[in-house]
Structure formats: structure tokens, C-alpha cells
Amino acid sequence: MSNSSFHASLADDFERFKRALPRDFPAHVRDVYRINLSARYLDEPLPHPIGKGSGQLSLNLGQLETDAAAGLAFAVLKTVIAQDSAGTQSMAAWAIHETKMKVERLGEGWTVTWKGRGWDRSFEDYLALVRASWDLTASGALLAVPSVKYHLPRLGEPFRDEEYAFTTRALANAWGRSPLLLEKDFSPTLAGDRLADEKAQILRWLREVPQRIRAHANVRLAMKLMNARFDDDFQAEMMNAASGADALVVFNRLFDVERGVAYGGSELSTRNLRVLDRPSGRQAVRPPLSGTGNIHSGRLIVEYALRGCSSVQLHTFFQLPLEEYPATEGSRTQRALHALIFDPRDGLIAVMLERERANTLHRRNGELHFLDLCAPRAN
């Protein structure tokens, strides 16, 4: 089938799938378009690159089951706050109840604003969610990974290793296999906190946290890096300092100091892509990347992939008013996937075919491969 014929099929599929996606849509994409959407997160194989970032949309089993039914590749659970065996949390200020999330337009895109922080229920409740997440992961229905905010000391202060030990061991026991897959969150509210006022302090965290976690269990660790309140050079320096992680999620939302809220939109993706586009941001030797920030189209997925991201994490795009999705039925997750994959102009299939026509993406054994977009570029 020619490239132009693929586009005709794509327009048909876009209309056809407005009510429901094929149960295994990556297989459909491979069969019809000869495009292999396989991706990776934390060295785990994924059927396609689209996952859900940590937050209010991944704090109960019902949400995860809905995501699995829709065909989402992976989800990161709401971030739990580390504690010691007595239940003491040095970062307890982050374990507060979320205010209502507000979805609003920001320029040409969308952002979600809220003032809440981490998991505000009991640690036992979180362990129960991790056990359920493991069941989904083990069945192949959905890779679902826990997220933690651990103690972060000031310069000259020691790490509270008892919190690292108790929390990591408990999560490893609940997870069900070794290694434990885990994401360490450096949140936008942390970026806005006085704790993150000093560059040397932030770099110490990034260098030392991986070994502190791995001292207590066999962990494959992703670190979700914040957008610090410094320049692009420092963002790249943060990536280098975090080289002890197994993967990096780049980068968390921006923080509005005056309003005291985190936000996204085009300002976020512009900064993230600019940092990743620097020679220091796209080194060949570094932990694998997962992109995040204002991803609302397959075209933006490709932009992150071209800068080395082998998967992406979305949050806002799963919360739009229903009328903003082209699909007419299904969960928000399913409607979002429909737009991200099948949109005839800006969907992932369309943009990969566009790059094939431009001779910047080539078939191997008759197929285009998403992961070929992520190959390191020459500096």
C-alpha cells in the first residue's frame, strides 16, 4: 500500500473509531499501516508510547481498570509520601487533600490547576493499591507503577534513611516481583518550595537519592525531574546529576510562585523541548527518557520522541470536557487515545507517515518503528 493509500485508510479509521477503538489497536495499526508503535518505560516493553502521569487520575483501582480497558500502555500511581515504621513523614506537608482540579484553556492548549499535593490516605491503603496494580501488570492488562516522594534534606543535613528503608521495603513486598518498578517524584510544588532555592541542594538530591532507595530493595528507578526555578543550563545539569537513575521523566510542570499553583500549557512544552534539544540534553549515554508536558497530539509525542523519549506521560489531556474530543463515545482515556493515534493531521500515525514522505523516517523490514524516532542525533 502506498503512503497516500495509508492516509485514505487513516481518514476512514478516524471516523470509524469515534465510537470505540479496536480492542488491540496497536495490532490494528501494525496490520493496516505497517507501523510498529512499540515503546519502552523503565526498560519495560509497551504496546505503544502513551501512558498516564502520576496524579488524581490514578489513585484507585476503578481508574486503572478503565485505563486498561481503553488500551492505555501504562500508568503511574498517585505519589505516596514516604514514612518510617512509626508512620512519621518528614515530607508530611505534601500529604494534604487535593482541592478540586480546574481544567482551563491556556493559549492554544489546556492546563489543569490545583493546590493539592500527594496521597492523603493511609499507607496501608496505598499498599493495597500497589498490590492491585501488580495484578494488572502481571496480567498484561496495564503496567501500573507506584510513585514516592522521599525525604529530601537541606545541605549539611543527613537523609532520613529509616523512611527510605521502611517505605521501599513495604512497596517491594506489595509489588510482587523483583525488581520493584518505582518512580521518584520531584514535584512542581517542591520546585516552588524554599527547599529548592539552592542549586547545590537539588544536585545533591539527584545524585544521592537513587543509592538511598536501592540500599533497601532491588529497584528499577525512574526519577521525574522538576522544572527548577533556574535557567535551561541548570535543567541540563539536573539531568546529568540524575544519571544514577534507570530512567528520567522530563520534565514536571512549571510553578507559579505568585499564585502558588503548578501549571502546564505551551510554555511547559516549549521549555521542555528546548532543554532536550540542547546537545547536553540529548546525550547518547544517559538514562532512557520518558517525556511529559503539554502533550495533546501525536505531533507532540513525536517531538518528544525526536529528543530521545521512548514513551510519554499525559495528565491534562485525559481531563478535557467531553465535547473537546473528536470521539463521541467511550471513557476520556479512550477518547484521548483515539485523537492521539488516529487524528488524520496531527495523530501519531499521520505524523510518522509524514516523516516517511519527507524521507526522515524509514521502514525496516517493511515497517515504520516508533522507537526509530528516538535514535540519538548527532550533536
State where each predicted segment sits.
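Glycine/Thr-rich beta-alpha phosphate-binding loop at enzyme active sites
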Residues: 24-33, 183-201, 225-285, 321-331
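Metal-dependent enolase-superfamily TIM-barrel catalytic cores that perform enediolate-based chemistry
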Residues: 159-220, 226-227
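Structural preference for beta-strand elements that scaffold enzyme active sites
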Residues: 49-51, 74-76, 141-153, 179-183, ...
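Alpha-helix-loop-beta-strand connector modules within alpha/beta enzyme cores
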Residues: 100-104, 119-141, 198-221, 261-289, ...
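Alpha/beta catalytic cores of nucleotide-metabolism and tRNA/nucleoside-modifying enzymes
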Residues: 1-30, 101-102, 120-121, 267, ...
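N-terminal capping/small domains of soluble enzymes
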Residues: 1-169
